Every structure is written in C-alpha cells, then in structure tokens.
Amino acid sequence: MPADLVIRGGTVFDGSGQPGIVADVALRGDVIQEIGPNLVGRAELDATGCAVTPGFIDIHTHFDAQVFWDRGLKPSSYHGVTTVVAGNCGFTIAPCRPEHHDAIIHTLENVEGMDAKSLAAGIVWDFETFPDYLELVARRGTALNFTAYIGHTALRLYVMGDAAYERAATAD
C-alpha cells in the first residue's frame, strides 16, 4: 500500500548523531512508515538539497499567554519545532486566582515587554488551577505539542496571596 506522503531525496538526520543520508521518507498519517530509496506515495514533496529531521523540542519558551491568541505558536512553528515547553523562567499565568489577574499581567508586562492592555485582551481566564490551564490549552488546540512547568511567581501568589511580595514562604 502506498504511503500518504513521500518526502523525496532529502538528507535524513535521525537524531542519533550519525551523519545524514540521502533517502526518501514515507509517511502514513503522521507516522513514519519507512525510510529508504525509491518509496511510493500518493503525494510527494521534493526535499532535494534540504535536511529532513525529527521535530525539534524547544525547552524554553514564553508561550504561557501567547498560546491563547496564537495557536500556531509563531515563530517556533516556522523552524521545525514540534514541541514547546513553557514556564521555565517562573513567570507564568497559572495557577491564578481572579483577584490576581492584574498582578500576573503586570509581571508578564515587565518580563516580556508587552503592553498590559494587549495581554489582558488576549488571555482567556477560563481557569484558576494549573491542571485547568493545561486542559483549556488542550481543548482550544495548538499547532504544536504544548506543555508547561508551574511558574514560581504564579505559584507563590496563588498559595500566599499578596504576602508573596512581603515575606519568605514558610511551612505555614
């Protein structure tokens, strides 16, 4: 049975560290069916002179808020990235109680250099907890695989309230 798509004649790098090889890559759906010469597919993409690689994983992004107004997660989706991880810097939007939306927006405004009004207009606040945030992102969908860490700033504010700005955390 022919593949759905054959990526023909590109230099295939498999991620193992071995040198690339010129080959065809046959796909059925989104699964690689075969790598080799002269493969047959219903559609073909000429990759002569191009690198064919596994999708890249960007382990440090700031898409926490952007995921709501840019499901394509640009520019990562333009560069072969297939999975993004948000929340590395500790400045995230979840978890967040409604009374702290402005504080989280202000933090992002300072860190990301974005206008607070634009952030407020773009963020969909249909969540409070971190699992609710991840569920909302999944339900809305993204062009890339998306995952995130819980940001330190948002977590402190969620647990300690405004005291997060005043004192160190304690076991209490």
Model-derived regions, located:
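Histidine-rich, glycine-flanked metal-binding segment
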Residues: 1-55
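Structured core elements
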Residues: 6, 26, 58, 85, ...
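Residue-level signal for pocket-adjacent positions within structured domains
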Residues: 8, 40, 63, 150, ...
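Short capping/connector residues at structural and topological boundaries
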Residues: 17-18, 57, 68, 160
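Di-metal (Zn2+ and/or Mg2+/Mn2+) metal-binding site signature of metallo-dependent hydrolases
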Residues: 51-75
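Divalent-metal coordination cores built from histidine and acidic residues
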Residues: 69-172
